[in-house]
Design a protein with these regions (language model features):
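Flexible, surface-exposed loop regions and adjacent strand-edge segments
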Residues: 81-93, 140-154, 202-212, 272-282
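Outer-membrane beta-barrel proteins
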Residues: 26-45, 93-109, 157-170, 222-234, ...
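Short intrinsically disordered, low-complexity coil segments enriched in acidic
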Residues: 1-19, 101, 158-163, 255, ...
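Transmembrane beta-barrel wall of Gram-negative outer-membrane proteins
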Residues: 31-139
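Intrinsically disordered, low-complexity coil segments
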Residues: 57-64, 144-153, 246-251
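N-terminal, post-signal-peptide soluble/periplasmic segments
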Residues: 1-44
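Face-selective signature of the C-terminal outer-membrane beta-barrel domain
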Residues: 115-133, 161-348
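Short, solvent-exposed beta-strand-terminating loops
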Residues: 1-18, 72-84, 133-137, 195-207, ...
Length: 348
């Protein structure tokens, strides 16, 4: 645990780490999250898990149906003190800062399995997996930065960065095995996977320190909020048809197989940044309450301007198909021959 009454946590994620991704409507400062981080009084690490399963017998033939599930949740806090220094090739130091970083990692894992056997010939299996991870932190740094505190004569200032990376993976798999005849067998399956990578409402604020020790909000697009979303839908299919052949050894290994696999993927990424001009006047640092300056009332009063940048995006669609044929023959008692043909097609 990271003990302390003033452990900082950014606003915008619930207990399970799922984040609020809503963006403001045009010309309104109605962001869903505060610029001022929350204070967590008792940031205790904790975790818990659940598991269970059962088997049933269905119908007159008492076909077995079984399921099993396991789920876990964890939340871990950490606090670090940091020293950040950078210089150019000549040795001149342009960054010399000390800071504090308050981090929280929230994770969930869910696994599920459902299996059904029909008449001891056919089987149907469903697998589910969910992995969710939210890594968020609040970082506060004070000191010299020659690039980002140019409003200060000696390049001194304060920087607060609040960032959350919210990632989710959901996997669904359905697999079946069908014994059509004594010699003919069909395996078929499909999976649908979803990936989401979110960075909602990253908040960066810079303040420059004047020679008299007071602070002002830094200009030149040093007050910003950033949103990005990556989504992927991934569908996979496969089918194998196997016909067993008779050989002189009655090995059961000789066969011919025909199969197909396909993959269909859609990727979409979108990112946008909001920039704010500096609200004029001195800023109190104890406590630092930026919501008193950046709000909808001050925007409408003309104390600062808000600019929404151009949306950066890309989209990729992939279609992948492949087919194959394979033959296996028991040549001798301890020698098996195998030959196959594979055809691959890719369209992006």
């Amino acid at each position: 645990a990271a003990m302390g009454s003033d452990f900082l946590r950014q606003e915008g994620a619930n207990y399970f780490g799922f984040t609020n991704t809503r963006q403001p409507v045009a010309n309104q400062f109605n962001f869903p999250n505060s610029l001022d981080p929350l204070k967590v009084s008792v940031p205790m690490n904790h975790s818990f898990g659940l598991s269970g399963g059962k088997m049933f017998h269905m119908g007159e033939n008492r076909n077995p149906l079984s399921f099993f599930m396991v789920a876990s949740h964890s939340s871990d806090y950490s606090y670090t003190r940091e020293i950040v220094r950078n210089s150019i090739t000549s040795g001149l130091v342009y960054q010399d800062q000390e800071g504090e970083k308050y981090s929280q990692n929230v994770n969930q894992l869910v696994l599920g399995n459902l299996n059904y056997n029909l008449n001891r010939k056919h089987s149907l299996q469903y697998n589910f997996m969910l992995i969710h991870a939210n890594n968020q932190y609040v970082g506060e740094y004070s000191g010299k930065h020659g690039e980002r505190h140019q409003d200060s004569e000696d390049y001194m200032g304060f920087h607060r960065r609040q960032q959350s990376n919210d990632n989710l993976l959901i996997t669904n798999q359905l697999h079946s095995d069908w014994k059509l005849t004594d010699k003919l067998n069909l395996e078929a399956g499909v999976s649908y996977n979803v990936i989401k990578g979110l960075e909602p409402d990253r908040r960066e604020n810079y303040l420059s320190r004047m020679t008299d020790g007071s602070y002002i909000l830094t200009g030149s697009n040093r007050q910003k909020r950033f949103f990005s979303t990556l989504k992927e839908n991934d569908i996979n299919t496969k089918a194998n048809l196997t016909y067993r052949l008779n050989d002189r050894f009655n090995s059961g290994r000789s066969s011919i197989m025909f199969g197909y696999t396909g993959r269909f993927v859609d990727n979409h990424f979108e990112a946008v940044e909001y920039n704010f001009t500096a609200v004029p006047g001195n800023i109190s640092m104890d406590p630092l309450q930026l919501d008193n300056f950046y709000n909808d009332s001050n925007l409408k009063a003309g104390l600062f301007e808000m600019t929404r940048g151009d949306t950066n995006s890309y989209e990729v669609t992939k279609f992948i198909h492949s087919g194959f044929a394979e033959g296996t023959w028991q040549l001798f008692q301890n020698v098996t021959g195998n030959i196959g043909v594979y055809k691959f097609g890719n369209l992006i």
